[in-house]
Amino acid sequence: MRYTSGAIETLIDEFARLPGIGRKTAQRLCMHMLNEPRTAAEKLAKALLDVKDRVIRCSECQNVTDRDSDPCVLCRSSGRDRTVICVVESPVDLLAFEKTGHYKGLYHVLHGVISPLDGIGPDDIKVRELLARVSRPEESLQVREVVLALNPTVEGETTSLYISRLLKPLGIAVSKIARGIPVGAELEFIDEATLSRAMEGRSAM
């Protein structure tokens, strides 16, 4: 059964488009917003528009950052180990590693993985930017290791293998986080202790 209000149905449909949100959850969110004062809806709308207007991808690591903070705070930090770059699939995965407090190097966010079945090739993710980054004279003198920390899926493994084959001729050591993370699992849902052990136990490819 659908609601008699077209506006309600439209909002439910928009909520349901979000990852992990089914129609029932979308309905609850919609009803919640209906019961909130207009100012709450205005704040939500402003926050959504601000994200689209103010957030960009860092020109160095491709992580998300504010438009007036590029390169991002991690890339600018003098306390990071600039000899190591950890390659992750998404900004959410980067946050997962940061929460461990263990890894102190730099990052590179691919914003996806190679997936031929979905029509996603190497040119559709940030591989070219990674190669350009490690090939710059000032970077090539510093970066000694690239750690591939992609989700343990077929697509993640394919992407890791592709990147390692591109990096090895450059004389950069390539490693992959240790096994122990369940196949098919998403890094954002792995506990911090397991992620720390996976990083510590990384092995050469």
Curated annotation (Swiss-Prot):
Please name the GO terms of the biological process aspect recorded for this protein, alphabetically: DNA recombination; DNA repair
The protein's UniProt keywords, in alphabetical order, are:
DNA damage, DNA recombination, DNA repair, Metal-binding, Zinc, Zinc-finger
Q: Which CDD domains match?
A: TOPRIM_recR (cd01025)
Task: Enumerate the spans annotated as Toprim domain.
Answer: 83-182
Q: Which InterPro entries match?
A: DNA_Rcmb_RecR, Rcmb_RecR, TOPRIM_dom, TOPRIM_RecR
Question: GO terms for molecular function, please?
Answer: DNA binding; zinc ion binding
The UniProt entry's coiled-coil ranges are none
PANTHER family, alphabetically? RECOMBINATION PROTEIN RECR
- This chain belongs to the protein called Recombination protein RecR
What is the source species? Chlorobium phaeobacteroides (strain DSM 266 / SMG 266 / 2430)
Q: Which gene encodes it?
A: recR
